Every structure is written in structure tokens, then in C-alpha cells.
Amino acid sequence: MWKFCCVTEKLTLFLFIYGICIYICIAVPIRSDLSTVFEPEAKGSRITSNYRRSLFNMLGYDNSVHPNNCKGSFLCPMLRGENRACPNAYMKYNRSLIYHGYSSYTASSCTAIYECEGDYPARTGNEIIDEFDQLNLQCSACGTRFFNNDNENTRCYVKLNYCYPDCTEITPSTSEYDYREPVRDW
């Protein structure tokens, strides 16, 4: 088929094809109605961005409801992989506490921050960890995720970011509540 004169050309072609596959599999959004993913709205038209949803709908995640920002330090890719730095940081939040202020926990150069602009509502550690899980599902390292149920004077978010060498943990005032793991019916 094609003849290549050197390894560099083969590598370039491989990287080009690999990049196209990654773009198709991850970056191109799909419709939320998976039965009509490949059907255009009208004959000859393309699917518009208003009807697109991210790949994470297939995983039970809808980014249109709670938009995430996957930006952070340029060193964030170092937090991905086997060391699970960011999940270890946000799992330091205590599920059985109610958080009333700014908090930050760290692990292996990753900081997990809960912050509000305005008044701090009483938010359980379980709710905070759930928001971090959704952020980590999409961004896999650094990013910011805003809560959806805050009042009009408050905007709260969770944030994962690279923090070395300035990693500090800040524990806010908390109160306890009776947390129980949900009962599973399986």
C-alpha cells in the first residue's frame, strides 16, 4: 500500500492516526439520546452543538448540568496515574462531619479545596466527596466543579490542583452528624 523510507515517517503516521482516534473517542461530544447518535436532525444537516453531550453521559455523568473546568497547574498531568494523589487528598474529608467554611486537604502534591464565594452553607463531607468524585471522573487530575444547589448569594465549588511546594491543609469549623452508608439492594 504505502512505502515508508524511515522510522520517523512511520511514527508520524502512527501518531496522526492515534490522535484522530483519541479525538473521535473522547473529544467529539455525542447526543444524550444514544439511539439517534448517528442520525442528523434534518436531511443533509449536521448535529448541532445544542444537542451534543459529552462522552461522560455514557458513564452516567452529564456535564451540562454541573459544568466542570478541567484547568489547573501545568504540572497537573503528573498527578494522574497510579499514585492516586488527588483521590487520596479529597478522601481526607470526613463523611460524618458538616463543613462550615473553607477547607483544604493535601496528598502527594495534590490539594483538594472546598470553597464558597459568600456565605458557607452547611455541607456534609459526603456531599463534598461526591462532587470531588464527579470532578475526578471527568478531569482525572486538576479542575473545578461548582455545586448546583446553592442559594443566590452563595456559589460553592470543589477544586483539585497541583500544590508542591506550598501544600497546606486547612481544617474549618465542623459539626458532626450521623452518617450511615446507604443500604444496597443487590
Curated annotation (Swiss-Prot):
The chain crosses the membrane at residues 10-30. It comes from the Eukaryota. GO terms for cellular component: cytoplasm; endoplasmic reticulum; endoplasmic reticulum membrane. Keywords: Chromosome partition, Endoplasmic reticulum, Meiosis, Membrane, Signal-anchor, Sporulation, Transmembrane, Transmembrane helix. Residues 31-186 are lumenal. It is found in: Endoplasmic reticulum membrane. It is a single-pass type II membrane protein. Residues 1-9 are cytoplasmic. One of its GO terms (biological process) is meiotic cell cycle. Required for correct meiotic chromosome segregation. Appears to also have role in sporulation. This is Meiotically up-regulated gene 117 protein. It comes from Schizosaccharomyces pombe (strain 972 / ATCC 24843). The lineage of its organism: Eukaryota, Fungi, Dikarya, Ascomycota, Taphrinomycotina.
